């Protein structure tokens, strides 16, 4: 898809994350479940899909005509990085035709000792036309990734790193600061549980937003309800 056309398509819209890890109820070895989630999202007005693994991305692209943010989650020894960590995953994602390639953009080092900024520069050198999103946790890392060539920075990892531990809600001030000062387009992602929060994130300056657990993870949604009910009984 043409870059400017993609920007126009997702601006101000909802991208739905359709993922199921092996430990989750909706995971199957054969796949086929996440494409159904993606179809439901597309029917309801989603402007894009975020997906994990080449299999799910390929299956999703067969059933919906929406831009896909692609990632590969994989743990590596010696690093907390797990979202598109090495060039091997990058090569696989580019080969399956992801519209936006997302990588972890936090402060930890990759297995080869490279920083997030160095990794993004390497991706852009190898695939200069590939749109890249950095999943960040704080302002400094987001700026470093943007300056390295990331087209998008996401708030994806805020609250999930040692430096941001304890942040359990969408940080609208952080979104606004990035939208005001960062040269990359800002995608609000993480801790968005309600439609009102999504609207507020866009009002804070987000270019677009990603919502996953509140839409496509039934176990998480159920736990939110049962947790509230059980708390009220005490």
How should these model regions be labeled?
Residues 1-95, 128-132, 140-148:
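Conserved N-terminal beta1-alpha1 strand-loop-helix module at the mouth
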Residues 14-18, 49, 68-71, 101-103, ...:
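Hydrophobic faces of well-ordered beta-strands that scaffold small-molecule active sites
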Residues 19-21, 43, 72-77, 96-110, ...:
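Glycine-rich phosphate-binding active-site loops on the catalytic face of alpha/beta enzymes
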Residues 21-23, 172-234:
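Alpha/beta catalytic cores of nucleotide-metabolism and tRNA/nucleoside-modifying enzymes
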Residues 28-29, 50-69, 80-87, 105-123, ...:
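Active-site-adjacent beta->alpha loops and helix N-cap segments on the catalytic face
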Residues 39-45, 123-129, 180-184, 205-207:
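Short, surface-exposed connector motifs at secondary-structure boundaries
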Residues 64-72, 120, 127-128, 202-213:
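Short, electropositive alpha-helical surface patch
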Residues 78-93, 137-149, 184, 188, ...:
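Catalytic cores of alpha/beta
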